[in-house]
């Protein structure tokens, strides 16, 4: 592991905007912020928007700057990647931006039913290998999971046209699966 990666992991632990639940918390599905993100983390009741697979978090930060009336949470498993967005959000004093470091498989352990208003899947790994198609962030099992914490009428916004075309007709539990973008 490179020394920059170790330094970034250590620095992430000092950023208020980085949330890193332990494996036991998410595995048991009782994460402390579940159902309490607005009250306990953001301190407001604004709509929550997730960016899944946020990578370096630049898009999450840009959304937070453009829409200060919403709360944004970038989600990625790679802490060294999240560092860039977390550092920018911290330096800019952004109170409406957070980063959640967890595996997508455990994300429903972190959010209560109806807690999330919108989900952005902007630049996901396409998982081109036939054996890994089920790992796509837009695979049916993930869409079903997102529906559990997406509010009624909430939207999933793919950030690229090929996936948008594929998702256009999907309805899941009364949720609008795709916004017109």
Where are these regions (language model features)?
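Conserved SAM/SAH-binding beta-strand->alpha-helix loop
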Residues: 78
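A short glycine-rich, Lys/Arg-flanked "PGG" loop and its adjoining helix->strand segment in the class I
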Residues: 138-152
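Conserved beta-strand signature within the Rossmann-like core of class I S-adenosyl-L-methionine
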Residues: 152-159
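Conserved glycine-rich SAM-binding loop
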Residues: 55
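Conserved beta-strand/loop positions that form the S-adenosyl-L-methionine
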Residues: 52, 75
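A short acidic, Gly/Pro-enriched loop at the edge of an enzyme's catalytic core
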Residues: 109-118, 123
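S-adenosyl-L-methionine
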Residues: 1-50, 58-65, 86-113
